[in-house]
Amino acid sequence: MSQSLVRTTAALVGGLCLAACAPVQPARPNAVGIAVEPRGGLVLHERAPGTASPTSLPPSAETRDTLQRINSYRAAGATCGTQRFAPAAPVAWNARLEQAAQKHARDMAARRALSHTGSDGSNMSDRVAREAYAFSALGENVSAGYTSVSDALAGWMRSPGHCANMMSKSFREVGVAAASAPGDSFGWYRAMLLGSPAR
């Protein structure tokens, strides 16, 4: 069965661009137009062998702070557009997701282009496969223009599709990264990958 990637259009939030992707194989769209459920037994051919093992503690104070902020949002529950999300379990930091997010953030900054498609035509599942992350559910948020991670996370929480990704109980791991683009009107590009490892 072929892979289906559901995309939402870029949203303008507070004058800054955001874009969200739904998980790779949604069961059906929810009220905000995306689904955040595991792919339900469908085989993805580009999936790398092996299962990524999350790191229990991010390597730096900045990434620990990022993880704490994400998990604070999840613990509080949220209304994403018209959909209410109950509090969700915390996610663990995953170095492979972070690496895939970092490479994509750098690629967007180098091109000065906010996109879920890499300069080589890759999508989020291609990028995590390159980092040997085998997944059962996967989602991606990208943003441009936010100078701090706290502002980027707050922006994603104001956008229904991004918020739904961050609040999804289907995701157990996360990696977030940023890259600067000096001289660009946005200045910073960020990528967040949320996933659950393959069983």
PLM-predicted stretches and their roles:
Residues M1-A10:
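Bacterial N-terminal signal peptides that target proteins for export
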Residues Q25-I34, P38-G40, F135, E140-R199:
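Disulfide-stabilized extracellular recognition modules
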Residues N94-T147, M166:
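Short, surface-exposed glycine/acidic/tryptophan-bearing loops
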Residues R64-A75, A95, Q99-R106, D126, ...:
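Solvent-exposed, polar/charged alpha-helical surfaces in well-ordered, non-transmembrane soluble domains
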Residues L12-G15:
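Classic N-terminal secretory signal peptides
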Residues H45-A110:
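A short alpha-helix/helix-coil micro-patch that ends at or immediately precedes a cysteine
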